[in-house]
């Protein structure tokens, strides 16, 4: 999710890609039988990643496989998948949060058993599901605490301090029903505090203290720069990206309260997609994790989602990221929290957002 923009639902089938698909469909031999090229079908990618358009274009250029990209926030994409579960319209999903994939996996909606032949680092190995139903592509952290250094001389040092009167009406965050990284953050807080009921109590107190909620990272950061809030709790990539580069605010700084939650981004394949499309989805995953694909990930959204921690050996994070060793992190079990996502988001929207 990029820093200061709200995603719009974009269906991309670029002219070159569409023409390629038409040309391939028209490739037949003299006896009317399709040639090998006609085996290429359109791969439908649902994605909430800032570098997805660049990746789709690079993948098509490298393979000739036509791709239709539906770029949107995670919440709406998951709603689309649920609405079309009996007649799926997607082939590959790429969003942040292993909890979302665990939930889909437990519903039987993801292809199992595929793992690309790559050299995982520790983050990658830790993020792999046992049944190989999704593939990690990177890691960010939730939530980073972003603040204006000129207005906040002494930022909070613990999550509990956000409940104090000092920060009444000054804390902003995202809506988990819209923002993919936000449910894992909420689940992480519940995990840290000891359970769902303890987490609900915490967020109820935070709301009573004037919590302000916007849909996604971009609007929440805009609330910070406009002065509506003094503290913004967002995904680390968005927080770091707000501090440098074009359109950034040099007065902003990022702090990590203990603990923050590891947030894997991942790719999952629709179990009900045609075989040809699933095979193309596997090729897409392999390309993303190739040296060429990693270059696209690290350049396609340099002030947003490119600010991730790699999951592959031999790939270093961009220099703007702090050493992960300097941050206290926790990992939540996606198969524990994923099935709870719908219920927790419903509770959050009914009791905290409204």
Where are these regions (language model features)?
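Conserved C-terminal helix/tail region of periplasmic/extracytoplasmic solute-binding proteins
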Residues: 328-354
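A bilobed periplasmic-binding-protein/Venus flytrap-type ligand-binding module shared by bacterial periplasmic
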Residues: 144-151, 187-190, 263-277, 296-299
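Extracytoplasmic ligand-binding site segments that recognize negatively charged/polar headgroups
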Residues: 44-52, 72, 76, 88-228
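Short, polar/charged alpha-helical segment
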Residues: 46-68, 79, 242-243
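Periplasmic-binding protein-like
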Residues: 141, 201-206, 213, 247-271
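Bacterial lipoprotein signal-peptidase II cleavage site
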Residues: 27-38
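A ligand-binding cleft/hinge motif common to bilobed small-molecule-binding domains
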Residues: 99-103, 225, 230-250, 301
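Mature extracytoplasmic/periplasmic domains
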Residues: 270-331
């Amino acid at each position: 999710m990029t820093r200061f923009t709200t995603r719009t639902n974009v269906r991309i089938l670029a002219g070159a890609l569409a023409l390629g698909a038409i040309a391939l469909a028209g490739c037949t031999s003299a006896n009317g039988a399709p040639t090998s090229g006609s085996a290429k079908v359109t791969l439908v990618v649902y994605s909430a990643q800032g570098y997805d358009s660049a990746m789709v274009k690079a993948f098509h250029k490298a393979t000739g496989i036509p791709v239709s990209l539906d770029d949107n926030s995670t919440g709406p994409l998951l709603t689309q998948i649920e609405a079309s579960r009996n007649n799926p319209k997607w082939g590959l999903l790429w969003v942040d949060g292993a909890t979302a994939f665990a939930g889909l996996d437990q519903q039987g909606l993801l292809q199992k058993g595929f793992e690309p032949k790559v050299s995982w680092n520790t983050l990658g190995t830790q993020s792999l599901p046992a049944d190989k139903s999704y593939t990690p592509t990177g890691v960010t952290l939730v939530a980073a605490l972003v603040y204006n250094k000129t207005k906040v001389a002494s930022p909070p040092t613990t999550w509990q301090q956000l409940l104090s009167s000092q920060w009444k009406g000054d804390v902003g965050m995202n809506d988990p029903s819209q923002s993919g990284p936000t449910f894992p953050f909420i689940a992480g807080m519940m995990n840290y505090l000891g359970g769902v009921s303890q987490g609900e109590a915490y967020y109820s107190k935070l709301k009573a203290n004037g919590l302000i909620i916007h849909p996604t990272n971009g609007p929440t950061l805009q609330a910070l720069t406009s002065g509506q809030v003094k503290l913004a709790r967002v995904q680390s990539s968005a927080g770091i990206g707000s501090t440098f580069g074009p359109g950034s605010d040099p007065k902003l700084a990022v702090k990590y309260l203990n603990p923050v939650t590891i947030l894997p981004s991942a790719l999952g394949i629709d179990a009900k997609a045609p075989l040809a499309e699933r095979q193309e989805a596997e090729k897409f995953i392999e390309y993303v994790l190739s040296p060429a694909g990693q270059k696209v990930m690290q350049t396609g959204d340099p002030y947003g989602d490119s600010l991730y921690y790699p999951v592959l050996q031999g790939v270093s994070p961009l220099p703007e990221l702090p050493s992960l060793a300097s941050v206290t992190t926790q990992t939540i079990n996606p198969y524990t929290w994923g099935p709870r996502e719908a219920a927790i988001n419903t509770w959050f929207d009914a009791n905290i957002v409204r």
